[in-house]
Design a protein with these regions (language model features):
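ATP-binding glycine-rich phosphate-binding loop
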Residues: 129-131, 211-213, 234
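Short, surface-exposed beta-strand/loop "edge" segments at domain boundaries and coil↔beta transitions
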Residues: 153-155, 227-230
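GHKL/Histidine-kinase-like ATPase module
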Residues: 168, 202, 217, 231-234
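GHKL (Bergerat-fold) ATPase N-terminal catalytic module, capturing the glycine-rich phosphate-binding loop
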Residues: 1-194, 198, 206
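Short, cationic low-complexity segments
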Residues: 201-217
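A short amphipathic beta-strand at an alpha->beta junction
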Residues: 215-227
Length: 234
C-alpha cells in the first residue's frame, strides 16, 4: 500500500466536503479528465508522426453496472504509465494539465508555419482539469475507485486502486488498447443518499446532458431502445 504524497485524509476530506457540495458533478469531472486525455493524444498526433490518430477516432464512453453498482468512464486517449499513475493520482491536487499547456505553448512558439499538420489547432486544445482535484470528486459517491490505464506506445497496462482513505495500490493489469478506464464502486445507500441511482441509464444520461454538453468529443453510452408493440384487434 502506497501513501498519498500529501496529508491525504485531511485534504481529501476537505475537497469532498468543502470544494464539492454537489455530488452529482463527479461525472462531469471524470468526463473532463477523459477529455483531457483525448486532447493530449490529439496534440501528440500533430507533432509525432508515429502517432496516427485523427480527431474522429477519439471518443469517451460512459457505462454502468446496476448489479455491481459501478459507473465507468473510459477514453481512448493518451493513457498513463505506472509512474504517471503514481505522479498524477498519488499526489492530491497535482495536475499535469499545467505542464501540458506549457509544452503546448512551447511547441507552437518553436514551430515554423506549416511545419506540422494542423499545428494551428494547438491553440484550440482545451485543458479542463487545471487544478488537479476533479478526479477525487469520485470519492463523494464511491467507496472505491479503480483506474486501469495503458499509455500510448506501451505494451503494459496498470491499475491504480484506492478507497480514498488508506492510500493506494498500483498493480499490473490488462487493457487491449491505449486509454484509461475509471471505475467508481458506488457507496451503499443511506437514509439520505441513494447512490445506486447513478448506476442507471436514466441517471447517467441526465447528468451527461446537464453537465457535459460542452465536451468536444463524442460521449457514447449503450441505451435501451423501446418500441410500441402493436396488438391485434380482437
Amino acid at each position: 500500500m502506497r501513501q498519498f504524497k500529501t496529508e491525504s485524509k485531511k485534504l481529501l476530506d476537505l475537497m469532498i466536503n468543502s470544494i464539492y457540495t454537489n455530488r452529482e458533478i463527479f461525472l462531469r469531472e471524470l468526463i473532463s479528465n477523459a477529455s483531457d486525455a483525448v486532447d493530449k493524444l490529439y496534440f501528440r498526433s500533430l507533432t509525432d508522426p508515429d502517432v496516427a490518430v485523427g480527431r474522429d477516432d477519439l471518443a469517451i464512453t460512459v457505462g454502468y453496472n446496476s448489479d455491481e453498482r459501478t459507473v465507468t468512464v473510459s477514453d481512448n486517449g493518451i493513457g498513463m504509465t505506472k509512474d504517471e499513475l503514481d505522479k498524477n493520482l498519488g499526489t492530491i491536487a497535482h495536475s499535469d494539465s499545467f505542464e501540458f499547456k506549457a509544452a503546448q505553448a512551447e511547441a507552437a512558439a518553436e514551430s515554423e508555419p506549416g511545419e506540422a499538420k494542423g499545428l494551428d489547432d494547438l491553440t484550440d486544445v482545451d485543458i479542463i482539469g487545471q487544478f488537479g482535484v476533479g478526479f477525487y470528486s469520485a470519492f463523494m459517491v464511491g467507496k472505491k475507485v479503480r483506474v486501469v490505464s495503458r499509455a500510448i506506445g506501451s505494451d503494459e497496462a496498470w491499475a491504480w486502486e484506492s478507497d480514498g482513505i488508506d492510500g493506494y495500490d498500483i498493480k499490473p493489469a490488462e487493457r487491449a488498447e491505449h486509454g484509461t478506464d475509471v471505475i467508481v464502486y458506488l457507496k451503499d445507500d443511506t437514509a439520505d443518499e441513494s447512490f445506486g441511482t447513478f448506476a442507471s441509464e436514466h441517471g447517467l444520461t441526465q447528468l451527461i446532458k446537464r453537465y457535459s454538453n460542452y465536451v468536444r468529443y463524442p460521449i457514447k453510452m449503450e441505451v435501451t431502445k423501446s418500441r410500441k408493440v402493436e396488438t391485434p384487434e380482437s
